[in-house]
């Protein structure tokens, strides 16, 4: 099941209870979507099954998201070994664009401030998902594509290019030449290899 359109019976910041075809659904949500009782809404769903080893029970929970991108990020997060659904939900309490930017720019310090995420988990999130979300940052920075091509032509590998894109800060108000940006990127890559 990808999404569900249902009538809201109860809603708060953690749970939505909805009815569809005379069946009640309890859906865990990351934040208060301000859903109105007795109104219809659509949530993108993910069913998570966990096994209770000592009781041989399978427990299924439904997680719901307002946007498909939130659902995709949730799936990406729980694919990481030390991140479970509760931690992923805590991460998604923040604005999705803020989280994607943090992953793309490897802002481990910010991610580590989120409840349930320690420094090690934040590093894992950045290391395993950075490649997926680096392009989102590139779309916001028009110079990033030119920088990527320039560094690739100079023989730098993909990891160095991704690192440079996340580290180079450009004031878009000023008219800066791409060669200056490439120069800054090369300095950042050099500093990285010195450490």
From Swiss-Prot:
Task: Read off the SUPFAM superfamilies from this record.
Answer: RuvA domain 2-like
What HAMAP family does the record point to? DNA_HJ_migration_RuvA
Biological processes per GO annotation:
DNA recombination; DNA repair
Query: What the protein does?
Result: The RuvA-RuvB-RuvC complex processes Holliday junction (HJ) DNA during genetic recombination and DNA repair, while the RuvA-RuvB complex plays an important role in the rescue of blocked DNA replication forks via replication fork reversal (RFR). RuvA specifically binds to HJ cruciform DNA, conferring on it an open structure. The RuvB hexamer acts as an ATP-dependent pump, pulling dsDNA into and through the RuvAB complex. HJ branch migration allows RuvC to scan DNA until it finds its consensus sequence, where it cleaves and resolves the cruciform DNA.
Name of this protein:
Holliday junction branch migration complex subunit RuvA
- Positions of the UniProt region annotated as Domain II: 67-141
List the disulfide bonds in this chain. none
Q: What is known of its domains?
A: Has three domains with a flexible linker between the domains II and III and assumes an 'L' shape. Domain III is highly mobile and contacts RuvB.
The terms under GO molecular function for this entry are: ATP binding; four-way junction DNA binding; four-way junction helicase activity
Gene3D superfamilies linked? 5' to 3' exonuclease, C-terminal subdomain (1.10.150.20)
Q: Provide the residue span(s) of the region labelled Flexible linker.
A: 141
One GO CC term of this entry?
A: Holliday junction helicase complex
